[in-house]
Amino acid sequence: QVPKAVMEAVKKKFPDATAESASKGVEDGQPFFDVQVKLKARNAWVTCDPQGHILSVDREISFQELPKAVAGAISKKYPKAAIRGVNEIVEGPETVYDLALTFNGKKLIAIFEANGKFVEESADDEP
């Protein structure tokens, strides 16, 4: 059962969204709740503590919504890459952008800070 405070926090953050699913987890001994919402045909995942404090928001965005510094850094590091998906992840004061892309025939996940600084790259095992 998802606490009322969690659902209220999600509704306040995304008033026009529809809750799709919710799950409970524990990290470092602390319980949390993940709520997936659908917002204008895109998904977002909101992670809250049991009191309804939002810990992080991970939402799908379009490439055009990326900050110019990030879009420029991607074009420079991965010229002619096919972008398969973009997520904006906000955790406290930090915002990073997680991109699923195909570059030189390889499926990759690349993460950039909001200022365009490259963070890391890993193989994308998703089909």
Segments the model singles out, each with a brief description of its role:
Residues 1-127:
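Interaction-mediating elements
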